[in-house]
């Protein structure tokens, strides 16, 4: 019996829960920022970060449910570190696309594609508006 897989699943599950909590709190804080003094770039970058946190948490939780380490702790940390240097929304999608090479579950991959297409449509339809949160998920997502 291989003991590595349960350990990775436990790590993924715990990290998923922690990242999910951080993402939710961060999103709520960003939702309160509705003043014109905040530049659109800051709002967009902040929303990208909160969506990324939520996405990583979802993948971790799915990984634990399927008892397969779909996303390992190190891959999440490395992607989150690379996210700090984002210049624009396009780079965000490029970094998130790297996740497709890590994922092995077709359901997760299809959800990932639908999620990114919906975010891309929102970004294209409402580019840079002052004091407005661009990505506002429905309460059912959380």
Curated annotation (Swiss-Prot):
Transmembrane segments: 10-30, 42-62, 102-122
Disulfides per UniProt: none
Membrane topology (UniProt): Multi-pass membrane protein
Localization (cell): Membrane
Keyword DNA repair: no
Keywords attached to this entry: Membrane, Transmembrane, Transmembrane helix
Top-level taxon of the source organism: Eukaryota
Protein name according to UniProt: Putative uncharacterized membrane protein YBR064W
Lineage: Eukaryota, Fungi, Dikarya, Ascomycota, Saccharomycotina
